[in-house]
Amino acid sequence: MEHTYQYAWIIPFLPFPVTISIGLGLLLVPTATKNLRRIWAFFSVLLLSIAMVFSADLAIQQINGSFIYQYSWSWTINNTFSLEFGYLIDPLTSIMLILITTVGIMVLIYSDNYMSHDQGYLRFFAYMSFFNTSMLGLVTSSNLIQIYIFWELVGMCSYLLIGFWFTRPTAANACQKAFVTNRVGDFGLLLGILGLYWITGSFEFRDLFEILKNLIHNNEVNSLFAALCASLLFVGAVAKSAQFPLHVWLPDAMEGPTPISALIHAATMVAAGIFLVARLLPLFTVIPYIMNFISLIGIITVLLGATLALAQRDIKRSLAYSTMSQLGYIMLAPGIGSYRAALFHLITHAYSKALLFLGSGSIIHSMEPIVGYSPEKSQNMILMGGLRRYVPITKTTFFLGTLSLCGMPPLACFWSKDEILNDTWLYSPIFAIIAWSTAGLTAFYMFRVYLLTFDGHLQVHFQNFSSTKNSSFYSISIWGKEVPKPLNVNLFLSTMNTNEKMSFFSKNTYQIDRNGKNRIRYFSTQFGNKYTSMYPHESDNTMLFPMLVLVLFTLFIGFIGIPFDQGVIDLDILSKWLTPSINLLHSNSGDSFDWYEFVTNAIYSVTISFLGIFLAYIFYGSVYSSFQNLDLINSFVRIDSKRILSDRIINGIYNWSYNRGYIDVFYGKVLSNTIRGLAELIHFFDRRVIDGITNGVGVVSFFVGEGIKSVGGGRISSYIFLYAFSVSICLIIYYFFSF
């Protein structure tokens, strides 16, 4: 066992040779490297698989042995200061290693096919391998200096991958936005690290925790300054894990390739912030009010992310806001003292969200031959619908991932999410109400995504996609739908006659004539004399295999944390895994879970989720939509003041969600303009005042010199006369003043 731990430092460096080899190959032998490009994908998967096997061995030993191992190399700069570099293996590290390697392998296998036709194939795998190296280095770091170094490398890799298609202006802007937003958090993290070093004199976690605890207990440190340093550390986690108010980069990060979205949202960049909070939780618990601050940010993010996901058209952006909301749950958990629940939900959410993003990539991949390769079309759920007929395997995997995220038993997220929901009642009833209500919103927006994508008919045939202005058959109008006919943009929920009434909550079904059916049946394009049907198609096996593997994780990974000890069989593997970390936090590890209480709370949470699913089916399900066109039902619809008021409320919710809560507008219009105005003021002061004084001295000197120059005519006699005259004047003045 000791032998295994001694070589654990190799794990972060295993994927790195791929990055170096691709870079050197493209520089030295570019033709051969490009011709053999598929072999680099194989080596990427192989090396990360070796890291996964190594990580699994460490995890098994952690579960069985439950102890913490740390090894450090000391680099002495002088007699008073030295830096230590090393690696730390504990339950938190082993959990993150398993997450990063397993999800990373699935994404790499998936990417081999997804990126096969992209000119940046090699560059993509070089970035991905370096991304995995950076994240593995981050989670094995033994001190804050190493954390910060790998933290910056993770940010750099995310910048490169989000802007992978940098020739696209939206992608270039998105990576810049992610970079700048994370700069704010990284600056806070750096200040917090320096502040804590100034207080404790150490970067090592164990020393830092013990010293700071003793200083606070003995009142030997200013508590406000310690709280400020801890808050600055948390700001770094807020930015990296897309928590309010530094969440604005996450939806725009969808401009990168879909495999990158899966990796960022499941096991790498957004998990880095959660990891930092979990690693520093012993520090946060001894500083007053920091835990309250963490829980407050978490609950705000939970609700904000869910509301912003309600009206998005882009399938990846909807999943991005879903990630933001779920990360809010994970951030809320340690804030209320539920360390185990936070890591449990981090695990279950990682696999479920990776499955959903890879499923969305399969959907986009199937839509691109029909609508083109523009993300505004291939990712637009309004042009989808009815895909269950064409991509059945993707549909099944996406459905299971959706159920898991909604908290449906016995899928993975049910067990972890319920644990967080139950713990919120012990912390604050207000937080509990928000968290439980958001569980219903989660079910609503996730099934909205599922129904818009897979239910009904393929909407690209009904959206005037051929750029024709007239369409005599089926039309729908839903939240986020751009109807062909002009509508009042200030009244998204129409109050037309019953024959033309549209709802942005539901689909309005109209009768399809024979021409419309023929158009649907034979929607095709002609290449020469050959007609090729333009319908979505299922992805290749290379893309389906990772999704099926992630389905297995989604089905069974939740069982590692079932909190029931039946005497003979202890199903709670996670608690055994986390025993050293729980003891470090001085938490009560002997908490018992009552079966009756758990089932009662589970019934409540599942009922709320079912309510959200039911509402989604009412508003977006094709079966229910067919009843909305009946005159009997329409006759009961009355346009009165209450209906208009409800329409305005719904429109307000829609506008809030679709416009991202106006937070981006606020940052763009207020903060950016304020900073730009301040910069212009400073520029004016520098150019006109500072430079004006300097230039004024030069101008005055110039004119004085020119004046003196004009006096002289170049004759020596004139100079002698002026000299004698000046001396005479000086003598006369001296004579009169001396008396």
Swiss-Prot record:
Chief localisation class: plastid
Recorded GO MF terms: NADH dehydrogenase (ubiquinone) activity; quinone binding
Organism of derivation: Acorus calamus var. americanus
Subunit structure: NDH is composed of at least 16 different subunits, 5 of which are encoded in the nucleus.
Gene Ontology terms: cellular component: chloroplast thylakoid membrane
Transmembrane spans: 9-29, 39-59, 89-109, 125-145, 147-167, 185-205, 224-244, 258-278, 280-300, 327-347, 354-374, 396-416, 425-445, 544-564, 603-623, 719-739
Key words, A-Z: Chloroplast, Membrane, NAD, NADP, Plastid, Plastoquinone, Quinone, Thylakoid, Translocase, Transmembrane, Transmembrane helix, Transport
Reactions catalysed: a plastoquinone + NADH + (n+1) H(+)(in) = a plastoquinol + NAD(+) + n H(+)(out); a plastoquinone + NADPH + (n+1) H(+)(in) = a plastoquinol + NADP(+) + n H(+)(out)
Enzyme class at the top of the EC tree: translocase
E.C. designation(s): 7.1.1.-
UniProt membrane topology term: Multi-pass membrane protein
Taxon lineage: Eukaryota, Viridiplantae, Streptophyta, Embryophyta, Tracheophyta
Gene Ontology biological-process annotations: ATP synthesis coupled electron transport; electron transport coupled proton transport
Source organism, top-level taxon: Eukaryota
Protein known as: NAD(P)H-quinone oxidoreductase subunit 5, chloroplastic
UniProt keyword annotation of Cell wall biogenesis/degradation present: no
Family the UniProt entry places it in: Belongs to the complex I subunit 5 family.
Cited function: NDH shuttles electrons from NAD(P)H:plastoquinone, via FMN and iron-sulfur (Fe-S) centers, to quinones in the photosynthetic chain and possibly in a chloroplast respiratory chain. The immediate electron acceptor for the enzyme in this species is believed to be plastoquinone. Couples the redox reaction to proton translocation, and thus conserves the redox energy in a proton gradient.
